[in-house]
Amino acid sequence: LAGWYGVLAYILIDEFKLQKINNIDTLDYDPLAKNVGRILFAPKDAENIKGGKATFVNYKYKDIRKLKYDYLNKFSLVTCTSCEHLAQKDIDHVIDRLHSDTLVVLQSNNYKDCNQHINISNDINEFRSLYTDKLDNVRAYVKPFINYDRYMIIGTRRKK
């Protein structure tokens, strides 16, 4: 979700060694993100193809508020590294449509000086509490920076 040109998709392709990744969809509300991602990662795609590694990044222009269960239930991992840019009800909409035991990775921060940050949490406990009724086995992490803290939680979609 909020794919940021597919950066995380390419990190997963290069670094995730536990099992083969068959398919990665990177979703963005900005239709230009697909074009930027394709240009940005064209050399990486060429390198992967030359090296015999297929690239499975599907750029999707989608409004997450309209995602349906039949689309979301095919994924075993869903990430959003920019929760601060999304309304909480929209994040909840996605999580509510995931199948049980889907691995969910969410990141946010407490940086208040960006007018595009519409959904920040004051601390990791507040961020984590947003998902206590939706996720099980939650692990929480904080990365301090000079002007703000970055939060990450990892959990599995609670059984419905």
Positions of PLM-derived features:
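Short beta-strand element of Class I
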Residues: 21-27
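C-terminal substrate-binding/active-site "lid" region of AdoMet-derived donor-dependent transferases
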Residues: 87-151
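Conserved SAM/SAH-binding beta-strand->alpha-helix loop
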Residues: 29-32
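A short SAM/SAH-binding and catalytic strip from SAM-dependent methyltransferases
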Residues: 74-89
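Conserved beta-strand/loop positions that form the S-adenosyl-L-methionine
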Residues: 1-2
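Conserved SAM-binding loop of SAM-dependent methyltransferases across substrates and taxa
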Residues: 5-19
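S-adenosyl-L-methionine
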Residues: 34-73
